[in-house]
Amino acid sequence: MSVTIDAQLAQSFGLTGEEYDKLVTIMGRTPSFTELGIFSVMWSEHCSYKSSRIHLKTLPTKAPWVIHGPGENAGVVDIGEGLAAVFKMESHNHPSFIEPYQGAATGVGGILRDVFTMGARPVANLNALRFGDPKHAGTRRIVDGVVRGVGGYGNCVGVPTVGGEVNFHKAYDGNPLVNAMTVGVAKQDKIFLSAAAGVGNPVVYVGSKTGRDGIHGATMSSAEFDEEAASKRPTVQVGDPFIEKLLIEACLELMATDAIVAIQDMGAAGLTSSAVEMAGKGGVGIELNLDAVPQREPNMSAYEMMLSESQERMLMVLKPERTEVARAIFAKWELDFAVIGELTDTGRITIRHKGEVEADIPLAPLADEAPVYNRPTVPLKAPARIETPADPEGIEKALLTLVGCPDLASRAWVWNQYDGSVGGNTARRPGAADAAVVRVEGTRLGLALTTDCTPRYCQADPKTGGAQAVAEAWRNITATGATPLAVTDNLNFGNPERPEIMAQFADAIKGMGDACRALDFPVVSGNVSLYNETRSPSGEAQAILPTPAIGALGVLADASKSIGLAMPDAHDLVLVGGIRGELGQSLWLREICQREDGAPPVVDLAVERRNGDFVRSQIGAGAVAACHDIADGGLLVTVAEMVMASGVGCTLEAAPTDVAAHAFWFGEDQGCYVIATSDGAALVAAAEKANVLAMRLGRSGGTDLELPGTVRVSAERLREINAAFFPRFMGEGA
């Protein structure tokens, strides 16, 4: 290929001038076109974590129940009975803006592979979706494509989609977020890792053929968007969930033998990343013969094959004597199987194609010795706490506005496009509890699963917002009765080269770390997505809200004893936790007063821990019939959601006089729960003994939510208003 290799070409590949000079020094010569491509993807933000790595190292990652933390394809935790949960969350933001259906679908496919490559059968998918303002011209198209893509892939591959989030804000108009999470279950003694070993062992390619889709997808995901984003459609991968299903079954069948030495999926940067990471982790070299790579298109170059991000592909190192056993399994499942290389003792990656050496690079500079930056930050000014605004329209009208607003409206339109029950092990479906609950087949165990983040809090105060995201995930797991075990994160931010954005990232990590340590909630896997910005024709950069999405997992000894939102008739409602009436950054402030200001609610991690441990103990003692944590919309929205979930009404008592009524009912105070119990007095007494604030709120019964003299609205009316937004926004039958 007669192309001049220089700093200008390297810059078009996403490398800086300094990085190009560094790679020339490493190579001792000008790189080939293929070598330049390999460096550009491995040193991209998406693959190298060069701006985030120093901050990520501060997060707590260890606990007695953690089997494998960050560094593998997914995190692994002990759930008892010799079993492990394997889970991770990952973004597909940039592709989902360019091509919403395929971007979202292949995001699901990629995270599934991260989990089953470790020997786990996937048992659940979740997703955290952030879209632009519903009034923005492009939002409806992106919502439609993303939701269909998530459902289309997950449904076909036979893994239930059991939970997640959907939020709207104008900051995502040009840059939606699609964060996908998969959870699998494996035997603890059957976990497969990615470190290659055994000089001379064969390197095997399995799955789909390689095409030209997705080339430079990793570098695209490491840059801002502009008005020409649509021209990048060729960098979006195209997925086939039916092939993925075959690949899952073939890999799990092979894993039941003793053939596999190491295994890695081909994700970002495709064959390049999988080969470099496997050999690098194992401290060996690797030689590839691209003539043997199964190709979907004719005349593919070495550069194209190494950088293609075609989906449904895996790379394995096998024991030589078991190669034919493996070949037979993949032939049975009608998948490609090719020996494309072997491990060496050189510490280098050598790539041959049509008799020529196309690349010969030392491995260390591509992986562990990739550039790492301690980017500059600026101090962020914490917003002042706001004075409680006057109530402009009354409690009942505000309640109806809130339950119908885009961020609180029923997500049934979304969930109904997902198969949430395939496999028959979903114990708590979306909307039925604060976290989804999935039974672990062959046991009584249950996994509680959630995703959480409140980006408007993070925008106002990234440290508090980071802590709150972790605390809310812990609280949602707790509300089901499960013991919270661990976290996977998906850190979505703007351009790290802007000091104010890097400060948001660093502060959010500090808050997350504080919360994880206080709650014994280690981070075992995750993903960083930077450069989530759109540049307008005038050159102005619009960053997303800082969005450190948290995926969390907990375990129940008995899935059948999980707790949901639906409250029975004739039960006391008890508030656990103290209400200050925190209206800063609340949905009430935004939807009723059209303001987005003030400090987010205080996150007191000691109180969070004490209250949550108390709630879990009461659930374990059989004293709790329903439980829901206070989050978006505040206390009255929490109660309304319990009314809508059950169809049972309730009568509430007046708010305490030391807090304005609207602040009491709509403040988004943290560390609080509403519990339905048969004996409210006993639960309040137990709380006092545990040094936990608690008070009786009222009693369930009838079909209306009633606050005497202030609110009287039927469960049916609440449901009607709550259900209206999505069908109206998307169009009936959309």
From Swiss-Prot:
Which InterPro entries does the entry mention? Answer: PRibForGlyAmidine_synth_PurL, PurL_linker, PurM-like_C_dom, PurM-like_C_sf, PurM-like_N, PurM-like_N_sf
Primary subcellular site in the record, as a coarse category: cytoplasm
Where found, per UniProt? Cytoplasm
Indicate yes or no for the key word Nucleus. no
Its pathway?
Answer: Purine metabolism; IMP biosynthesis via de novo pathway; 5-amino-1-(5-phospho-D-ribosyl)imidazole from N(2)-formyl-N(1)-(5-phospho-D-ribosyl)glycinamide: step 1/2
Q: Where are the transmembrane segments?
A: none
Keyword annotations for this protein, in alphabetical order, are: ATP-binding, Cytoplasm, Ligase, Magnesium, Metal-binding, Nucleotide-binding, Purine biosynthesis
Positions annotated to bind ATP: 49, 88, 489, 526
Care to name a GO molecular-function term for this sequence? Answer: phosphoribosylformylglycinamidine synthase activity
A GO-annotated cellular component: cytoplasm
Q: Which residues bind Mg(2+) 2?
A: 114, 265
- Catalytic class of the enzyme: ligase
The family this protein is said to belong to: Belongs to the FGAMS family.
Question: HAMAP family, from UniProt?
Answer: PurL_2
What name does UniProt use for this protein? Phosphoribosylformylglycinamidine synthase subunit PurL
Q: Please give the organism.
A: Gluconobacter oxydans (strain 621H)
Q: Which gene encodes it?
A: purL
